[in-house]
């Protein structure tokens, strides 16, 4: 009995790749208005000026992104890992808004400390939830193994410490193991603006971040990859890649990875999501999509 091959194997075995791909094309005019895969971002109740590359900037993504602020959830409260019942309800409302009202494919956040609420966020939606790039650690560890190390860059390594047990439980990763190196950027000139909500000066901060990366690698030459935990670090990822030659993973890479699960291969996709996106983003500013009474309570002009 002859062996019957399907998929790409079948194409290579005798059907002819070109003909196979032609048959895989969706019918003309199938649905020109089909919705592109999109990202939902749960935002802190604070105002800062995101750089291109930051999760808070829609220009960081090549697909639609929608934002929803959580009234009352300040940076300090998020960092503590404890929400009041009122803020918890607002958190739930934000996720359900992104899921049901905007129909996003994946939900993430604009602060790495949202990892405190990874488990809770999953209760409110069936969509993939990745509150922090730390969720990538298990895959990175599996890919690199125990012979290499992963450097985890954060805004402040000291304030990240209390989240150790939550990360261990949610990600199955113990960053106290020798294969992880925690790196705080709190001493990088200009990066203190993150804590105060002030705009980051890209030209001022970039040399310090790159210098920090080189220093850490010099001290730990067996580092094989870098993970940016803070959502305001991705604007510097390209410079760190260029300076170190190492792969750098961050919140943008994390979002891209999970979005790709909803996007067909552009060579032979079936659902038209591979059609070019027109680049339109929903306009967003702090205070959008919240009730007037919440604006009065939590948003200052």
From Swiss-Prot:
Protein name, per record: Dimethylsulfoniopropionate lyase
Active site: 111, 230
EC number: 4.4.1.3
Keyword Zinc-finger: no
Note, other: At least 10 million metric tons of volatile dimethyl sulfide (DMS) are released into the atmosphere annually by the dimethylsulfoniopropionate lyase in oceans. It is a component of the tangy aroma of the seaside and functions as a chemical attractant that guides various marine animals, such as sea birds, invertebrates, and some mammals, toward potential food supplies. DMS oxidation products act as condensation nuclei, causing water molecules to coalesce, with possible effects on local climate through enhanced cloud formation.
GO molecular function term, any single one: dimethylpropiothetin dethiomethylase activity
Catalytic activity from the UniProt record: S,S-dimethyl-beta-propiothetin = acrylate + dimethyl sulfide + H(+)
Induction remark: Expressed at low level.
Keyword terms of this UniProt record: Lyase
EC class: lyase
Family assignment from sequence similarity: Belongs to the aspartate/glutamate racemases family. ALMA1 subfamily.
Keyword Lyase: yes
